[in-house]
Amino acid sequence: MMSLRSAFALLPLFLFLIVANVESRKDVGEYWKLVMKDQDMPEEIQGLLDASNIKNSKTHAKENKGAIGEFEPCPNASAYGDNEIHANENKGAIGEFETRPNGSAYGDNEIGAEFTDDFEPRPSMTKYNA
């Protein structure tokens, strides 16, 4: 008798999950054109589909415009795997630049650094061992 009560308690949750996903595909017409090689959907089928274009903030992804404006990132020197990078090796490279470098090593100790004039980075050093 107790398992029947718990099943009835979970029933509204499962029904909500099913109903929430009913309108998962809004652009059925676009899918039809893609599959049918740019042929229009027949009028007989169009009447069967609900093609409302009402935007729901929960179902449509918001566009991320990225970073706008100036910001100061925190660069780091990172080493992954069996890289042998010591603090003594990096001191010479740091002294040669006006801005502090962002050096990263991946795989076979290939160290690359990219700089942008607008940034004033703060140094940090991270090493990940395998």
Swiss-Prot record:
Keyword Repeat: yes
Residue numbers spanned by region 2 X 26 AA tandem repeats: 60-111
InterPro entries named among the record's database cross-references: Organ_specific_prot (IPR024489)
Family: To organ specific protein S2.
Protein name stated in the entry: Organ-specific protein P4
Top-rank taxon: Eukaryota
Keywords: Repeat
Tissue/organ expression: Expressed in pods.
Span list, region Disordered: 79-130
PANTHER family from the UniProt entry: ORGAN SPECIFIC PROTEIN-RELATED, PROTEIN, PUTATIVE-RELATED
UniProt Sequence repeat ranges: 60-85, 86-111
